[in-house]
């Protein structure tokens, strides 16, 4: 690990203290994990503390870990990951938190910290069903208004539930149940040992 990443890891531990669940450095990237209850406070500290100064939010995404890894996943299902940039210190970091409730995954909104996260949170809501308390306009952004479900969840069927088509008799687009037979898609992956140098970062 480079001295720059060591300094960042040490600063995160010292400044965030008990809020830190883990700090992992892998392949030159730092991932900071905090509890969902500490997510907003940690984000504010990452932005405002003079030794961190993560002024810019690059991206926010949802994660569904229900089919993660080689075996059955036993941890919490849903997480949110935020990618941040410190222009002051030339650092990048990934902030991750797992939702406490898999049935109703909830996080505090970061719109008050980085206003540009607004549409990213709407996207995570739309595609993963993640809720963001305090968001000023949490509604779907990519799927149709009447869309049922959240298409990036691992249990969402590949073919979906309904399909759209133009009905010339009615002169409009109509929804109907999917006409494709559902099937299980299991890709066959053959990898050599140490493929992509995984685990050696």
From Swiss-Prot:
Compartments where located: Cell inner membrane
Entry keyword Heme: no
EC numbers: 7.1.1.-
Cellular compartments per GO CC: plasma membrane
Transmembrane segments annotated in the record for this chain: none
Entry keyword annotation includes NAD: yes
InterPro entries named among the record's database cross-references: NADH_DH_suC, NADH_quin_OxRdtase_su_C/D-like, NADH_UbQ_OxRdtase_30kDa_su, NADH_UbQ_OxRdtase_CS
Pfam families named among the record's database cross-references: Complex1_30kDa
Database matches in PROSITE patterns: COMPLEX1_30K (PS00542)
Chief localization: membrane
Annotated catalysed reactions: a quinone + NADH + 5 H(+)(in) = a quinol + NAD(+) + 4 H(+)(out)
Membrane topology recorded in Swiss-Prot or TrEMBL: Peripheral membrane protein
Top class in the EC scheme: translocase
Disulphide connectivity of cysteines: none
GO molecular function: NADH dehydrogenase (ubiquinone) activity; NADH:ubiquinone reductase (non-electrogenic) activity; quinone binding
Alphabetical UniProt keywords: Cell inner membrane, Cell membrane, Membrane, NAD, Quinone, Translocase, Transport, Ubiquinone
HAMAP family given in the database record: NDH1_NuoC
Similarity field: Belongs to the complex I 30 kDa subunit family.
Role description: NDH-1 shuttles electrons from NADH, via FMN and iron-sulfur (Fe-S) centers, to quinones in the respiratory chain. The immediate electron acceptor for the enzyme in this species is believed to be ubiquinone. Couples the redox reaction to proton translocation (for every two electrons transferred, four hydrogen ions are translocated across the cytoplasmic membrane), and thus conserves the redox energy in a proton gradient.
Quaternary structure annotation from Swiss-Prot or TrEMBL: NDH-1 is composed of 14 different subunits. Subunits NuoB, C, D, E, F, and G constitute the peripheral sector of the complex.
Name of this protein: NADH-quinone oxidoreductase subunit C
Gene: nuoC
């Amino acid at each position: 690990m480079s001295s720059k990443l060591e300094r960042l890891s040490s600063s995160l531990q010292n400044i965030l203290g008990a809020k830190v669940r883990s700090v992992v450095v892998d392949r030159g990237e730092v991932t900071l994990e905090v509890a969902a209850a500490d997510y907003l406070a940690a984000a504010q500290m990452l932005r405002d503390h003079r030794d961190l100064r993560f002024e810019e939010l690059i991206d926010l995404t949802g994660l569904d870990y229900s089919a993660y890894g080689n075996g059955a996943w036993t941890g919490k299902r849903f997480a949110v990951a935020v990618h941040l940039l410190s222009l002051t210190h030339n650092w990048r970091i990934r902030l991750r938190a797992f939702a406490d409730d898999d049935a109703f995954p909830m996080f505090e909104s970061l719109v008050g910290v980085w206003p540009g996260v607004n549409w990213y949170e709407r996207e995570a809501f739309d595609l993963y069903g993640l809720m963001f308390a305090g968001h000023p306009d949490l509604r779907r952004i990519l799927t149709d208004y009447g869309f049922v479900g959240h298409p990036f969840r691992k249990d969402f069927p590949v073919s979906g539930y309904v399909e759209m088509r133009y009905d010339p008799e009615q002169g409009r687009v109509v929804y109907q149940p999917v006409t494709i037979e559902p099937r299980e898609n299991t890709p066959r992956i053959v990898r050599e040992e140490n493929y992509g140098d995984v685990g050696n970062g």
